Amino acid sequence: MPEFNIVEHTCDICVVGGGLAGCMAAIRAGELNDRVILVDKSNPERSGCTATGTDHIWAYFPDIQKTEGVSLDDLVEDHVRSLAKGLINKEIIHYIAATAYDRILDLEGYGMKMRYADSTLPGNFRLQYQLHSCRNTLHFDGRDVKRVLTEQVRKRGVKVADRVMINDLLVHEGQVAGAVGYGTRDGKLHVFHAKAVIMAAGRPNRLYKTYSGLVFNTRMPPALTGDGKAAMFRAGVELINMEFVSIPGRWSSKNLVRGGGLPGGSYQPCGIGVNGLDEVIRPRNHEMGQWQGPATPFGTDKTFMGELKAGRGPIYADMSWGSEQDQTYMHWAIANEGSGSCFHHLNQQYGIDFRKHKIELWPLEPEHSAAAAGGPIIDGKCQTSLPGLFAAGDEAGGIPQSVVPGALTMGHLAGESAVAFAKQMTHVPPGGNFDTLLEFSSQVKTRMHGDAWQEAQSFIQNVMSDYNIAYRSGTMAQRGIDSLTYLKQNMRLSAANPHEMTHCLEMRNLIECGEIIFRGTIERRESRFRIFTRLDYPERDDANFFC
């Protein structure tokens, strides 16, 4: 077995993941404790789902919602019933709704612009309808939110270990003792000994084939490969709802996938949907400044797929509608949301103009995010079933559609909770072993002329796309498990450098997540709305599967 250079780190709080949740956890923990380390697979300045910005966040705005007759409890109940369909951690979603406004004020205090002179609402906030039945989604200048948060992380004395991919947790006598990761640039193994760990590594992307055929052309960051969920599972942490799938049903720009509302967020108020005959098939759902109700989802299989099957494709987003004020607002919003700035590059480079050119749309690949919300079950303090281990944001299970406010608020709460836990301990526990990770990495490192990680990636995506979406059933899921087991037992990955080693470690985690999803599918013998369907169990079974 070849020797790896091992770098030891010791801290009280180890935060895994530098997205919104991880940064907020590090900020809050850093305010209460001077021995905090933030570990990020990339660079926290531009990592996570808001790496290139976000233009919206929902919250309860007391001065606005109260005048409209909406209480905090009303908003929570709306979220529970309409978005989560009852399957949600009510204590956490109440906390999110109650404190999201405070986190917005935090962002404003960090220097982000949240108020606008053209708004007539109390506080000069630009609010839209989006997810809920009340107007409570704030549009703001969020392009550089990650840079701002990373600056705040460093100001609090938090040590940042970037370019380190956490692979496994250290466990000692039934309690978390830290985490171990691989340096994606230096090729070293980094061992973090800690009293408490906050897991905020995000969702498992890259499980399914993309419509463009490009592995990394995904709506959300392709670097998110379920590393945290796989590590927690290997450590014996209880996971829930991993079998749930969000999307298909949403559409995005063809061959240039981007996140963000389409058009319920960034694209309103200009966007409409038209077919190949230029017939309007998805009208505008409100005029600028004249919101009538919650935004209509722009792309649904029922409408858009129906047009394609009827021979009336392609499908386009036509943003030429609306006044100059509408256009200005839309361009501002898109520039702050996800990879929307790519459109401005296309405008400058190729003359693409929303006022003149329609944007072709195509379905998005399936995801395990948003409405799906699979991950570790957490209590009201964000603690998982493993003492000392906390989870926040997309990492946590059972909080559908918590999105940006969920990341900010749960990160803040997890930071406080982890510090409180660490205070009870007199010393950092001795580290557990990571022999399995060391053995896997050593084999990949020394193997000559082995399998490329791309081959394993293609295998995984074929298996997940074939057996877990359109034709999902118990027998199909078992076939999926058998296929992933064959891959795990027979693949002989090799890596010539740290970059390739990182991708090989990602394959290890994707296989783990895929198998968890299939096993969850077998156990959930029912169908539940759009997030989970089984052809052999087409009916909902609340008696056995509703909590």
Where are these regions (language model features)?
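An anion/pyrophosphate-binding glycine-rich loop and adjacent beta-alpha core
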Residues: 231, 237-359, 408, 417
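Glycine- and aromatic-enriched mobile tails/lids
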Residues: 1-10, 34, 43-45, 52, ...
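Glycine-rich loop(s) and the adjacent beta-strand/alpha-helix scaffold that form part
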Residues: 199-257, 404-417
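Conserved N-terminal glycine-rich FAD pyrophosphate-binding loop of Rossmann-like flavoproteins
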Residues: 42-68, 249, 257-260
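Glycine-rich active-site loop/strand segments that organize a redox cofactor
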Residues: 59-95
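N-terminal Rossmann-like FAD-binding beta1-loop-alpha1 element of flavoenzymes
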Residues: 13-38
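Conserved redox-cofactor binding core of oxidoreductases
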Residues: 46, 103-193, 203-211, 243, ...
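Core beta-strand elements of the Rossmann-like FAD/NAD(P) dinucleotide-binding domain
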Residues: 8-11, 185-196, 385
